[in-house]
Amino acid sequence: MKAPIVILNFKTYLESSGEKALELSKALESVSYESGITMVAAPQTTDIFRINDETNIPIFAQHIDPVSPGGNTGSNLMEALIESGINGTLLNHSEQRMRLADIAEVIQRTKEQKITSVVCTNNIETSAAAATLNPEFVAVEPPELIGSGIPVSQAEPEIVEGTVNKVKEINKKIKVLCGAGIATGDDMKAAMDLGASGVLLASGIILSKNPKTALLDLVSKI
């Protein structure tokens, strides 16, 4: 997937659910077309099929469970999500933590299915551990900064830079994304200057008065 990349995690905000999820996805598609920057939607499972049907942007699941087809009530089945239209998935977000063995299993299955994996981490050490599993992306997000409006790229730049360096030592092909508190063009530029290949963000865009305007500002300095 071409860098720089912006992944918008829709989480479970009402502002990014149902009809508003589609509107947000169309804003991502429009800004991607105008800027030439890869924009990815990570909507709730219920909205994936419609967004895939009505837009041409990449779609990631917010989570996939390490289950096979069968009796797994309430689980997110990879095969069903692919059928609905995903191109990849987030894994181990701070709001949906996973065991290391489960992360490894899902990453292996994403490779078999040829979809992209993004493992979320919270510091340099866990980023290094994630890199040994060979996902396509590691997204570092100190949990105390998530939703805070304080960007990690400026509050704790050493975490971003240290993660980039450590991950590249393990596997140069893995790209690092910067998350937590990202909202503006200055935030994204700071992340890129520290070696990140893009950003993972949510509330800074979703809860803004005009998400498309906020997205345009986000990529304005790249």
Predicted regions located by residue number:
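Glycine-rich beta-to-alpha transition loops that act as phosphate-gripper elements at the mouths
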Residues: 63-66, 70-72, 99-101, 119-124, ...
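Active-site rim beta-loop-alpha module in soluble metabolic enzymes
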Residues: 112-177
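Glycine-rich phosphate-binding active-site loops on the catalytic face of alpha/beta enzymes
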Residues: 87-98, 138-151, 194-214
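C-terminal helical cap(s) of enzyme catalytic domains, especially alpha/beta-barrels
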Residues: 106-112, 152-158, 204-222
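Catalytic cores of alpha/beta
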Residues: 122-134, 178-199
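Conserved, mostly hydrophobic/aromatic
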Residues: 11, 44, 81, 141, ...
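Glycine/small-residue-rich loop that forms an oxyanion/phosphate-binding "nest" at active or ligand-binding sites
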Residues: 56-110
